[in-house]
Amino acid sequence: DAKFGKKTVRQTPSLEEETLGVVLFNKTIDSKKTTKEILEYNNKTNLQNKKLQEMFLNYNNKYEIIEEREDTRYYFTKGIKYMFTIIFSRKDLIEKYLNIKIEQEFPKTPGYFVLLQHTFSKNVLLKKKPKMYLQWENALQDFITNH
């Protein structure tokens, strides 16, 4: 969901009592691509989603694998208070959009950013020193290890 509430820089909320919604990577339905390109992209996405689910088996708190919906408040009604999403973008775009500063080893290279968002208020919860990663698996592993 492209709409955000306030940006809150603080420690990540305690997720021990809450169910975390883990958003799957999106498949493409881009009509400008050939059928072969769409199938290849979607197969790659299926593999990413499988690996995402496997890696989350190491997460110690409650979570539910979900697909992204337009209105995130739907998840709130299902008992999911926070959403975990991995975003792929350029550092400058995320900094501009969220009005934050991000650490990244290679600032000109697009990377992966973990977005933790409250499902009802749409507030974005940020670490004191947000960071981007070159590999989505590293972003996910950092989240699992530190939350």
Q: Where does each model-flagged region fall?
A:
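Short beta-strand and adjacent turn/loop elements
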Residues: 1-147
